[in-house]
C-alpha cells in the first residue's frame, strides 16, 4: 500500500470527476464518482481451467512432501489455505527447518498476473520456473538451503507411485514424469487459486450493508489521501511491480538481479491485498506486526535512501483515518475454496 503520489490514470480521473479529488482534501466523492470508482474494482469472471486433470494432479503434488529432499516438507507448509496461502511465521523455513530471510507470499490470483514474474524479487519468470526452483534447491524458492537436492531422486519417488503414474498419463499423455512436468502440474493448480469472494466484492456489487461505514471511508482514503491505489489499485490490489518502500533491511530484493537500476535496490514485489488481514506479520521479512503498524510505516515514509520509491512521502493521518483504512482492508478477506484447500 501506500504512496502519496497520484498518477494520471483511470482512478485519478474518476476521483477528480465533478471536482471531487483529491477525495481527502475535498470531502466525500459524489455518488456518481464513487460508483465509477467502484467499477474499477469489480472482479472479473474466474479464469477457465485449461486442463482440470492437470490442475487436480498439481493439487495432489502441492500437498505431498515427496517433492522435498527430506520427504517431510510440502508446498503447503509455507502456503496454508486457511491463512490466505501463506503462514503466520515472520519468515519461511527451508526444507531443513531453518528460517530463511523472507516470508512466504500469497498465491491467490496469480493466474490473472499475465506475464508478471514470480516471487518477492521476481527472479522466476513463470510459475513453472518458480516451482522448479523450489524443488531443485530445497529452499522453497528462497535461495537459502543447506540440503543438497538430487532431482532424479524426487522424480523417482513420483515414478514409483502407481497413483501418480496413472494421473500423469491421464493429464499429460505420453509425457515423462520429470521435474518439468511436475512443475507444469503445480503451476496449473496454482493458477486456479482465485481470491475468495469477500465482503468488499458484495459491496462493489451493490450490497450496501456488506461493509461498515468505517470501511467505506477507508476505501475513499485508499483511493485518495492515502493513495494506496498507486501500487494496490484494481480488483487484485497489486500492480505486480517492484518498489522500495523504505523497510529497514539488508536484503536487496530485486536489486540482487537488477544491479544497474538504483530504484530496484531493496525493492520487492507489491503483494496482493486480498485476504491481507489473515497474514500478519507483514512485508517481505515479516517485520511489521499489524495492519495498524503498516499505516504508521507509510505515514513516516520509510527509510530515506536513494532507492526509495519517489512515491513514498510522509503523510499525516488521524487516528480515525488509520482505523478506517484497517477496517477497509479487513473487508478483503475472502472465503476459502474448500475443494482446493482440502488435503
State where each predicted segment sits:
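Periplasmic c-type cytochrome electron-transfer domains
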Residues: 2-7, 21-343
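Bacterial N-terminal signal peptides
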Residues: 8-18
